[in-house]
Amino acid sequence: MENSGINLTKAKEANRALLLQLICTSESITRTELSVRSQLSPMTITNIVNEFLAQKLIVETPPEDTARVPGRTPMLLQISPDSPVIVGIRMTIHCLYGIVGTLTVHPIIQKDLPLSDKETEETILDKLRQLTDALIAETDRPILGLGISTAGVINQETGVIEYITNFFDIKTLDLRSYLSQFFSFPVFVCNEVHAAALCELYFGHGQTENDFLYVGLTHGIAASVVLGRRLLSFCGEMGHMSIDFHGPKCACGSHGCLELYASTPSILRRITAETGVELHDMESAVQFAQTNRTAYAVFYNAMRQLSYGINNYLNLHSVPTVILGHDSYLLPDEIVAQMEDKIASINISMHHFGARPKLIKSKLGMKTQLYGALCIVLQQLFQNGTTFSFLSTND
């Protein structure tokens, strides 16, 4: 009997989290639509919606054009302007990018804190605290939590970066323990490409794609696999997949890693070496390649290498869709089409099912990089509602 009570409580909390996810990821939604999509009874919908209204998490509004709605006008449910907000920080080697956003990842405040080339573990942690303080000082709404997205292998249970390369002289960093000393809200840490994949899942192509591979081209190369609308929690370090055992030595200790050939810095270095033109970011490199055949050839060869790396993932997981994000979002459509053709010509797993892999660009574009930090907290809310007191119940 005791176990039954526990299970019932968990079911109620799970139902609350599910309905909140449906409301957060929709511009607006009716109670009837909630019942259909959640497969919960109208009575359950009514009870939970009324609780959310009382807690000022959501509001009910009539549709803009009531004349077109026959019969009783269905009220639209939306996230309330008084609901809690989320703090997000994206940590890169050059800058800390901060944001305060709503439960629908609409930005309210954005602040950046540049990093020097001589940062240490102590200075990085202190600057994270400074930026968080600056962000929360500009909102009087309750803070749901802080999400930090970063490169590296992350232990999400402890909030520790367990291994990171090319990040000053830092190899490990305990973010949660340090920041939890200063803030009462929960702190969550996630690999930045995993975070971007969550953003794509909740607010991008994931709304229609249940299974996909998200590929992020940055200082390195990382990938995240979503199967059955669940993010697989392996490290996703695609860039450290060796494609040439006799190639140059990587910072990870291996040889011929993919990121030495197809990451953003490697592409920029190769263009400079072959054209004499120094470029500083992917956007300028793509523009230059449109008018320079040598630079275009660098892109072509690098993306051919990346295609083999993507194909290895597809052969393992048989996902039909590849979403290109971070700097790979900037790739010319012609290059993306060539990559898709190349992968289709060598892929085995999808061919077995008579299907062809599809490459598409992120629906949210470059915004997934920062908004993903917000989605780290949303994932906890949607999948583990008991982390947040307003979803727990004593019924």
Where are these regions (language model features)?
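Short glycine-rich anion-binding loops that position phosphate/pyrophosphate groups of nucleotides
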Residues: 151-153, 218-220, 328-329
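Glycine/GP-enriched mid-protein hinge/lid loop-to-helix segment characteristic of carbohydrate kinases
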Residues: 110, 120-121, 171, 180-290
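Short, acidic, Ser/Thr-enriched surface-loop or helix-capping motifs
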Residues: 102, 156, 226
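Short glycine-aspartate micro-motif
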Residues: 76, 86-90, 143-147, 212-216, ...
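ATP-binding/phosphotransfer module of carbohydrate and carboxylate kinases, centering on a glycine-rich
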Residues: 1-112, 117-142, 258-395
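Glycine-rich phosphate-binding loop and adjoining helix at the ATP-binding site
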Residues: 107-117, 121-211, 334-346
